[in-house]
């Protein structure tokens, strides 16, 4: 069979990629090795930028709200000895101050949406589109390039049949262990084996334990069961993650019975019944691919980068990858852009992945400051794993092994219990120190700068000699601007702007379309110019579309100048700006577009031929 695009991997990034391409008239086949969507939570942080992208796909806020942890239940991040005991430290990540900050820079707020629910929302959105087909139980085996096509070998799990799929492009969205990436010979570089984790998915009603500190995350500081609870739905289900320590311990050392004992210890009470629904194990890594393209194979999402989960950046970086690539791929396939535009994908997105990877690793190491503030040495935990798993220890009776383990566990348990209860003046002082260390972790949970603040450079941006402003804290804050390369800023529209029920400037962006927006003397010309460009361009007069307050913001973002024309790419990043006294001519705007798309003016105006794309 032959398809325009073959996408391998039906996780959130692959599903998003297929939907974005479909909306631009590009057909795809999406194949997935699993026999269906994920059934358990994995990633769960959905950032403001990701929600903007999902909204562009027509996914309504109401659809996400039905599967989102209520903000009131995800207000804090808390540290306890176990889930049943009192807080040792707590920080607020979902308070009003943070919402005010988010609302000033985006029309969407970040949310906790468990991945298996997000996949279902995306799959349902994809099912309503033409130009895309999804097949489960299909394993990608190999590929080779033949001229301007890639021939992939796919194995059907049900029949065992191996069949060929010819495509113009092959997209690897098959996760951190990507077979497609390995097949393309693309290497990953970075930190390996940062940690090894067992994940316990379980059902329980945790409301009696968490009602006084409604938190999305609870860190348990018990030596019996150190780890992290992710409380997606306190009434129904949650996740517990705990480390193990190769080579002394292996996943096989954690059967259901042992995980039940560890989970009971982490809960800290026998009063809460639970049922383990699944177990998994994984290795925490921090890798970024050397390149995002090899011939006609492109990497997106975790196939291109894998981060520690500390920061919740992985899924969101992947969704933004798809958003950056989809419009470029569509225009190249439609003959409206030169193939060099594809190379700007890796040039723009790889630096973002490197920055997000570094931030995630920093967060991971910084979390140790909390246990260090308690006077606990994390290095004792691998030693415990070594002792309890050594050959001599395994030969001992269970009671003796427990006694040996107790030599390591008891001092830590005694210390954390006294600190939690502030049992002495010294313990109270330590608890205050732990609280300060916890408060110093906010960069882990507030990453709006990383989410919205990056500005692209390179061939797909026509710079004007200015540099996008950078916030004093580029992780937690963002400075909006009209600088080429920056994200199109969020501002409020006028009530009578002709876009009923739309409040954010991002509602002006139409999938697969450029936006030509003008202010001051440039405004009226932009609507006229947009209709003459021979490409999908929406023209907007910002003097009419923006609210009165927003116009003042726009002038400030434009370095105090009242006149400007802004060409915004389909992925919502500013491609070009003119601040000349007079509006730009059609030739000037066409020249900017042609430079970005790497084509001649004659190709810009030629009729669109989509017959090979569907």
What spans do the regions from the language model cover?
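Helical substrate-recognition/capping region of FAD-dependent monooxygenase/halogenase enzymes
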Residues: 2-4, 8, 23-24, 33, ...
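Core beta-strand elements of the Rossmann-like FAD/NAD(P) dinucleotide-binding domain
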Residues: 3, 159-169
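N-terminal Rossmann-fold NAD(P) dinucleotide-binding loop
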Residues: 14-15
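Glycine-rich FAD pyrophosphate-binding loop
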Residues: 22-42
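Active-site-adjacent segment of FAD-dependent monooxygenases/related oxidoreductases
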Residues: 42, 47-125, 221
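Conserved FAD-binding catalytic core of PHBH/FMO-like flavoproteins
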Residues: 63, 124, 169, 173-284
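A conserved short coil-to-beta-strand element within the FAD-binding core of flavoproteins
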Residues: 136-150
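FAD/FMN-dependent oxidoreductases across multiple families
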Residues: 252-313, 317, 337, 352, ...
């Amino acid at each position: 069979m032959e398809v325009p695009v073959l996408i391998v991997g039906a996780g959130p990034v692959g599903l998003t990629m297929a939907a974005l391409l479909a909306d631009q008239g590009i057909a795809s086949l999406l194949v997935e090795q699993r026999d269906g969507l994920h059934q358990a939570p994995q990633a769960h942080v959905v950032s403001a930028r990701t929600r903007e992208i999902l909204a562009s796909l027509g996914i309504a806020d109401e659809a996400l709200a039905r599967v989102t942890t209520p903000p009131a239940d995800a207000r804090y991040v808390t540290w306890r000895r176990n889930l049943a005991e009192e807080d040792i430290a707590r920080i607020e990540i979902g308070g009003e101050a943070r919402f005010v900050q988010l609302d000033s820079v985006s029309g969407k707020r970040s949310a906790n949406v468990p991945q298996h629910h997000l996949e279902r929302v995306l799959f349902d959105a994809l099912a309503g589109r033409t130009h895309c087909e999804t097949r489960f139980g299909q394993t990608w085996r190999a590929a080779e390039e033949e001229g301007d096509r890639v021939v992939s070998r796919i194995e059907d799990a049900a029949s065992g049949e191996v069949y060929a799929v010819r495509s113009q492009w092959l997209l690897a969205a098959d996760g951190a262990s990507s077979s497609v990436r390995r097949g393309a010979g693309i290497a990953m570089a970075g930190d390996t084996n940062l940690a090894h984790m067992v994940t316990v998915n379980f059902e329980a009603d945790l409301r009696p334990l968490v009602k006084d500190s409604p938190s999305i995350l609870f860190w348990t500081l018990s030596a019996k069961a150190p780890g992290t609870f992710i409380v997606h739905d306190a009434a129904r289900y949650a996740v517990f993650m705990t480390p193990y320590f190769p080579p002394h311990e292996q996943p096989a050392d954690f059967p259901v019975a042992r995980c039940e004992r560890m989970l009971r210890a982490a809960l800290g009470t026998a009063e809460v019944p639970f049922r383990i629904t699944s177990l998994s194990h994984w290795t925490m890594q921090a890798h970024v691919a050397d390149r995002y393209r090899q011939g006609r194979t492109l990497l997106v999402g975790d196939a291109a980068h894998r981060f520690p989960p500390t920061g919740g950046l992985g899924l969101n970086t992947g969704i933004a990858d798809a958003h950056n690539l989809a419009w470029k791929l569509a225009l190249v396939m439609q003959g409206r852009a030169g193939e060099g535009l594809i190379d700007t994908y890796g040039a723009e997105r790889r630096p973002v992945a490197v920055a997000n990877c570094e931030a995630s690793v920093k967060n991971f190491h910084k979390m140790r400051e909390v246990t260090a503030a308690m006077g606990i040495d994390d290095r004792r935990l691998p030693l415990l794993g070594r002792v309890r798993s050594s050959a001599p220890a395994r030969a001992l009776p269970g009671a003796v092994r427990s006694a040996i383990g107790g030599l390591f566990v008891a001092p830590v348990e005694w210390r954390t219990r006294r600190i939690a209860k502030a049992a002495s003046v010294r313990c109270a002082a330590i608890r205050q120190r732990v609280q300060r260390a916890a408060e110093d972790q906010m960069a882990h949970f507030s990453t709006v700068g990383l989410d919205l603040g990056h500005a692209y450079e390179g061939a797909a941006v026509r710079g004007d000699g200015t540099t996008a402003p950078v916030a004093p804290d580029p992780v937690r804050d963002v400075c909006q601007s009209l600088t080429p390369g920056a994200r199109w800023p969020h501002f409020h529209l006028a009530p009578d702007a002709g876009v009923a029920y739309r409040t954010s400037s991002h509602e002006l962006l139409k999938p697969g379309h450029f936006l030509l927006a003008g202010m001051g003397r440039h405004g009226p010309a932009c609507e006229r110019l947009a209709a003459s460009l021979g490409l999908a361009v929406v023209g907007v007069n910002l003097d009419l579309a923006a609210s009165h307050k927003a116009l003042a913001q726009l002038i400030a973002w434009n370095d105090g100048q009242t006149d400007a024309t802004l060409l915004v790419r389909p992925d919502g990043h500013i491609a070009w700006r003119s601040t000349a006294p007079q509006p730009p001519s059609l030739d000037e705007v066409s020249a900017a577009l042609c430079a970005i798309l790497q084509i001649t003016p004659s190709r810009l105006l030629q009729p669109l031929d989509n017959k090979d794309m569907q």
